[in-house]
Amino acid sequence: MTIRAYVGLGSNLDSPAEQLRSAFQALDQVEATRLVAASALYTSDSLLPGQPXYTNAVAALDTALAPLALLDALQAIENDQGXVRKERWGPRTLDLDILLFSDQVLDQPRLKVPHYHMHA
């Protein structure tokens, strides 16, 4: 059985638009997962002063993976594209976050869904 998941993408280092385009391709290659739709790219300010603006997008995925398995796949894509997590809200080559996982509410140490930065 597949469910619909929404993934937020963001980058503010090393050609952000190209990072996101590569991430869309990688998302479509994840096991038991299909990229259904991709938003246009848009720009947002960094949460911390002095950092470059972020290029962002959202992907809709149909996946048969469990939430933590999808998270592991997203982190593998981040790592493949050189993402380094040095500081919270710091600059990122690529940041992939599960925003929604069907209608599930998850509160686990590694994963909180809906994503804690989503607002009604």
Curated annotation (Swiss-Prot):
A Pfam match: HPPK
Transmembrane segments: none
CDD domains associated with the record: HPPK (cd00483)
EC number in record: 2.7.6.3
One term of GO molecular function: ATP binding
Keyword Cell inner membrane appears in the UniProt entry: no
GO biological process: folic acid biosynthetic process; tetrahydrofolate biosynthetic process
Reaction equations catalysed: 6-hydroxymethyl-7,8-dihydropterin + ATP = (7,8-dihydropterin-6-yl)methyl diphosphate + AMP + H(+)
Pathway the protein takes part in: Cofactor biosynthesis; tetrahydrofolate biosynthesis; 2-amino-4-hydroxy-6-hydroxymethyl-7,8-dihydropteridine diphosphate from 7,8-dihydroneopterin triphosphate: step 4/4
Primary enzyme class: transferase
Chain coiled-coil ranges: none
Keywords, in A-Z order: ATP-binding, Folate biosynthesis, Kinase, Nucleotide-binding, Transferase
Family stated for the protein in its record: Belongs to the HPPK family.
Function comment: Catalyzes the transfer of pyrophosphate from adenosine triphosphate (ATP) to 6-hydroxymethyl-7,8-dihydropterin, an enzymatic step in folate biosynthesis pathway.
Name the UniProt record assigns to this protein: 2-amino-4-hydroxy-6-hydroxymethyldihydropteridine pyrophosphokinase
Organism expressing this protein natively: Pseudomonas putida
